[in-house]
Structure formats: C-alpha cells, structure tokens
Amino acid sequence: MFNEWKTQAGLMILMGCVSLTPALAAEKLGKAADNAIYAQTLANEVMASHPELVVIGLHALKPGNTVETMIASNLDRIGKKDDEDDLAVSHERKTILAPNIKDPTKFEVAVPLHDASGKTIGSISAVFKYTAGDDEVKMHKAAIAIRDDIAKKIPDAAALFKPAK
C-alpha cells in the first residue's frame, strides 16, 4: 500500500512538473537586434570594442516593473528574468567569477552595474573566451574596466531604457 501511494505521489509531482514545462518554455524572449533602447547601444559598443568577449549581458529593473531582467545583450535573451546569481550581484554587490561548466572555453565575470554617480543599478555579465590556465584575475579587472567605462555613459537607471539614438 505504501509503495502504491509513494508511486502515485511521485507521479503527481512529476505530472505537475511536466505541466509547468510548457509555461516556462513559453517565456517570450526578445531579440537583441530589435532592442531599440540605450542599454542595447551600450552592449553593442562593448561587443564591438572587446573581441575577447563572447557574451555581454546588462541586467536591471525597468521603471514600473517588479521583476529584474536582462535588458540588453548580444544574445536573443532580452527580457529573461534574472536568476539568483544575477540578483545576488545587483542586490548584494557580489562578484561572480566562474568557468562555464558546459563549455570550458568560456569564463563568466558578473559585477554590479553602476550609473555615473556610482549607484548600483543592476548587474553586468561578461563572458570571456577562455583556455584552462588563463588569468581569471585579468578577466575580472577587464570586466570592472568595461563596467566603469559604460557607467560614465549612464546618468541614471532610467536612461538605460530611453530609445536608442
């Protein structure tokens, strides 16, 4: 009897997960090419001037929203909800240095994103080309330099969402 109940309970949980999968898969993410805001202009400039990067992602809370998302990137993931790592970087001012487990040729550095006054307004994730043994501290310094460079161009968080010129 216990085994039947255990199996039924397991199936109910499994069925619940399966039924949620289409809802999660239905999350509609925007294309970088269609993202006509200032933050995307900044992301495009960073990618054009840093050939050592594979990915750049800017994360912030859009005025009027309650959920923080990826607001600009070279990937078609615009609007992707921030995960707990993204939120830890922006809310707790943490820095993340991490090799990509699935692709050992990539190394991610995530740091808080600042505006020109130094206020934290989100996070920036920079994914570098990587070979085992590369200098991770150098990548961290490069990510900080990228962040500091674009911070000078951001008067406040609202500016990120203004139409691109």
Question: Residue locations for each model-derived region?
Answer:
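Short glycine-/small-residue motifs
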Residues: 122-123
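Extracytoplasmic/periplasmic sensor domains and loops in membrane signaling proteins
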Residues: 73-101, 141-145
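Sec/Tat signal peptide C-region and signal peptidase I cleavage site
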Residues: 20-26
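A short beta-strand signature within small-molecule sensing/ligand-binding domains used
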Residues: 104-112
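Flexible loop/coil segments at beta-strand boundaries within sensory signal-transduction domains
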Residues: 115-119
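Bacterial N-terminal signal peptides that target proteins for export
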Residues: 1-13
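Short N-terminal helix-loop-first-beta-strand/juxtamembrane motif that initiates sensory/input modules
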Residues: 44-65, 145, 156-160
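Juxtadomain coupling helices with adjacent low-complexity linkers
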Residues: 27-40, 128-165
